[in-house]
Amino acid sequence: MDDKEMIGAIQSTMYHQCQWRGYAAPADILVDIGVLSRKKYEDWRYGRISYLESACTVNLRKLSWIMHQIRSYGSQSGLKPSFCYYKQWGVKKLSGQGHKPVIPLRFSKSGNLEIERWYATHFVDSKRIAQLKVETAIRNG
């Protein structure tokens, strides 16, 4: 896929995610455009892969470019950036009691805080969220 096709795929994916649930998430975009398999994404969420970038099929330079395109489209489309804390799935309670420990997930090889923050930033379509809430209320009401 050349750069122009990739930009089209990113924008289309972000648009459809926003229509479906009111926001677009970079990790889901990577899955939808074929850069990250669903299985490897789930392996990362369960802690079987140490950082998300290692599971992607493109190099770090291309991944950085994709992330830039995601941020650009979000900004151009008036989507609101919103940080989302990613924690490991499937964590058991220690000794069967109390709260489960929270294990944060890592996105990048470097662990750079700015890179981590951009991977964890969802792009929210506030107007679409309001529409979805009304549609849900009508269905349930």
Explain the meaning of each model-derived region.
Residues 39, 60-141:
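Phospho-regulated, low-complexity intrinsically disordered regions of nuclear gene-regulatory
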Residues 2-27, 32, 36-37, 43-55:
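Positively charged, polyanion-binding regions of nucleic-acid-associated proteins
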